[in-house]
Amino acid sequence: IVLHGRAWGELYVARQAGQPVFDRADADFATVLAAVVASGIAQTERLEEVRKLAFTDPLTGLANRRAVDVRLDEAMERHRVDATVVSLVVCDLNGLKAVNDTHGHAVGDRLLERFGSVLSLCGAMLPEALAARLGGDEFCLLTAGPPADAVVGVATELCDRAAVIELGDGVACGVASTGDPIGPVRSARRLFRLADAAQYRAKAARAPGPVVAGRDGEVVRLADSPPKSAHDRRRLRGNRP
């Protein structure tokens, strides 16, 4: 079986003892069959590559926003069915603009890649966590199952590691979890708004660790309040369906 000009595998055919030996027509049929198998494998690989491109951030190799939306909707459905704890950590990498302005966008991209690696390593501490880049300097970590305290612990570790990344200026990190006292969370949009509000508060306070919705009394109020202006960054995910 030849795939992309290289030997991918072998196809064997056999007959029971006493049956006629294979002739040229049989060999030709086997060749055609191998080509059909190779075509099917190639198509499957192409579809997998398209799927990967559709759900992967090309710079960091992490999941992208589309993947987060799909996984978060699935997680919230589990939460509605059996009260699975769903947690969202939203991060804003500090200092990226200064790095881009001072050292160039290539260096800024390397900073994003380094933080993406740190996020992936921290995400591996939680079962089936999804590490993603939402776009620009924003990242997130999504979990379904681990308790809120475990997620906050990993978010704290993430902040500690981000603080020592070369050329970086730490990370503003907000956490929202259905395992914390944040009121009913019936939609992915609500959880995103709470996590975004927590991250917004962490950014404003330059908090060294994560700000957690339900543990910081201002976060829920901030999530529920209207934007103060058209340029308020809390509008970023406010219109998410």
Swiss-Prot record:
Pfam families: GGDEF (PF00990)
Domain GGDEF: 84-216
GO biological process: cell adhesion involved in single-species biofilm formation; negative regulation of bacterial-type flagellum-dependent cell motility
PROSITE patterns linked to this entry: GGDEF (PS50887)
Positions of the UniProt region annotated as Disordered: 215-241
Alphabetized SMART domains for the sequence: GGDEF
GO cellular component, as recorded: plasma membrane
Top-level lineage group: Bacteria
Signal sequence annotation: none
GO molecular function, one term: diguanylate cyclase activity
Positions with biased composition (Basic residues): 231-241
Name of the molecule in the record: Uncharacterized protein in hutH 5'region
Lineage of origin: Bacteria, Bacillati, Actinomycetota, Actinomycetes, Kitasatosporales
